[in-house]
Amino acid sequence: MKLLQLQYFCTACKYNNITRASEELHISQPSISNAIKELEAEFGVILFKRLKKGFTLTREGETLLRHAQELLQHAERITKIMTDRGPENNSIRIGIQIGRAHV
C-alpha cells in the first residue's frame, strides 16, 4: 500500500467518479483505476461497485476511506512538522511528479 494509491482512492471517493478525480489530480483515468485495483488485490476485497456513472462504496471501501483519510492527514502533519524543524526551514522546496506537471 502506498500513500499515492490512497490519495487516488480518496479523491475518487470525493467525487464518486474516477474521471473527475483524474481531472483534479491531472493524471490519467487508468492510473487511478490501476491504483485502486492494486489496493483491491493487496487487501483481497472489492472497494466499490462500479456503476454506469460513478460507483458506490462497499463496506470495505467505506472502512478504507475513513482510515485512508486519517492516514493522509497524519502524513501531511508529519511532513509539516519535520520540514518546520529542519535546518533549512527558511527555504522552499517544490516537488512535482512528472505526471502532474503542467506547462
List each model region and its residues:
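The N-cap/first-turn positions of alpha helices
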Residues: 2-5, 29, 54, 61, ...
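A short LG(V/I)-centered, amphipathic sequence patch enriched
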Residues: 9, 40-57, 79
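Alpha-helical linker/hinge and terminal dimerization helices associated
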Residues: 42-43, 64-86
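Residue cluster at the C-terminal edge of the helix-turn-helix DNA-binding motif
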Residues: 15, 24, 37-46
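Interdomain hinge and pocket-entrance segments immediately C-terminal to HTH DNA-binding domains
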Residues: 84-100
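Short helix-boundary/capping micro-motifs
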Residues: 10-28
